[in-house]
């Protein structure tokens, strides 16, 4: 391993796509042809190597990004298989953070689907170079050229077509390589392992020439010398074309587009060649952003084996044989088993025990790993997703990952009291694995409440609790994660006094509460916060050491708002005055005063209930359009847009989450199962007063 494990030989890639575009099948074929998998696993039979959790095999969707290492030519390819279902976009975002490049798989029939757009935008956020594989070219209605147009219209991407399909639908038999200007045809009987080159079929010559010219026009722009050569009529060599495609892919000047049918074993080897030829190695990425712990300075750290060790933990998984596994991407330096490193986010030391290279669900022990590698570490105590592991002497914190707030919650209780402790352990393990899943206890009812990104997300958590931890649970109806806020500025002056024998308590606070959107001089770093606290105490009216007590009190009490007990968000609290007593004042006294000030002051701020609004996208045949729009309107939805997509219509609407429970069944019956939808969290908005009254009455 170590001889060829040099940085320029590594490709860290993700394979991402819409659910059902054939992403897992494509990954399976890659593992098969790179010699890592001896039997091809079919998703629809529930046997794919990457989909190794039982729930994934049953549902035929990929939930956990399993990291797999394989070889092609003399390169090492680390593949992160990412989920394509909208409830799991957090997993995709997490994988994109540690990748150097990605292959976006598109369905040749459906083209660019809603989740593909979400994933593409996430990849844009992390500047991930990528190429496109138009899959399912053997299916009825597959249209490569329409897909390419959709890449432009839908994603605003610049596709660079480097292959054309030979034959369509059931007659699809190979591709035209526009770099070599040769046809590549697969033998059906050899499971796609055998293919041969031949001249381009006569009926495709003109189309191949047309697309070859388009390809050259785009790539020569990246190099003046080659441009001159091209314009003067000289032949541009295949090597020059490849070099420029690589340059343009890495700089995101364009996205190479390939085609094939993973299920029919056609087009996978040229896809692997393209991964190696065009996607970046860690050296091409060059740097990773982070902060030096000793100085607090933001810095760009070089990706290099000779630099001090720095790695990012991007995934935690429970393995039935090894226990907890932490997947890390090493950005610089190297580690060996037995070394001690530091988790710089938590300031805790971690000893490196077993290090494993993962192949979907098999593992290989390694003693050393270095920059560019993706490995799993067994037995880390304090490290969670998004933490940095670093060299003890030169400590750095790599860029943190941001995780969205959950929008749906439900109460769970174990079926027997004996399972209470087991359930607590199971949920805390699952929460460590998945930062978009939260667990809390409702103090009033004593119930355990779990929160997540959607119904499917929580269903799978409960399913895993049952299978992996053997905990049976009763589940409450899903609840919407409402919030509260204030709509006008209010001021409160409150004195907390308790002087009945023994040590007394005294604290006076004067606080101004204001809606965040009305704060004029809000700092940039505070704009995305739910709550901002500032002290404007001058002249020691409240001593410095007591001010954290005020902030702590407000932070705790805002979890139970004044309308219906939901967390209070989007407001700023400014401590402007106060008073203290030399003997009777304490941090605790100021904490109590702040809580009471909140309770008394907030009702004066005209508080309102907020609800999560989801962006819902429905794709439907024309004939059901009227019924579907009528139904969305009846759910308090606001239609944002209606666009034709092929022979279907796409309706985008903002709909309150509270109205979306069970929508999948309604949509199925409205469209005889032909329409599909996806939804993602958009924003919080005020609840209409008549709905707010119903919610308050239920609390």
From Swiss-Prot:
Subcellular location: Cytoplasm
Protein's recorded name: Elongation factor G
Gene: fusA
GO cellular component terms, semicolon-separated: cytoplasm
The tr-type G domain, residue ranges: 8-283
Entry-linked PROSITE patterns: G_TR_1 (PS00301), G_TR_2 (PS51722)
Residues annotated for GTP binding in this entry: 17-24, 81-85, 135-138
Family: Belongs to the TRAFAC class translation factor GTPase superfamily. Classic translation factor GTPase family. EF-G/EF-2 subfamily.
GO MF term set: GTP binding; GTPase activity; translation elongation factor activity
GO BP of this protein: ribosome disassembly
Biological function: Catalyzes the GTP-dependent ribosomal translocation step during translation elongation. During this step, the ribosome changes from the pre-translocational (PRE) to the post-translocational (POST) state as the newly formed A-site-bound peptidyl-tRNA and P-site-bound deacylated tRNA move to the P and E sites, respectively. Catalyzes the coordinated movement of the two tRNA molecules, the mRNA and conformational changes in the ribosome.
Keyword Ion transport: no
NCBIfam families linked to this entry: EF-G (TIGR00484), PRK12740.1-5 (NF009381), small_GTP (TIGR00231)
Major location category of this protein: cytoplasm
Keywords: Cytoplasm, Elongation factor, GTP-binding, Nucleotide-binding, Protein biosynthesis
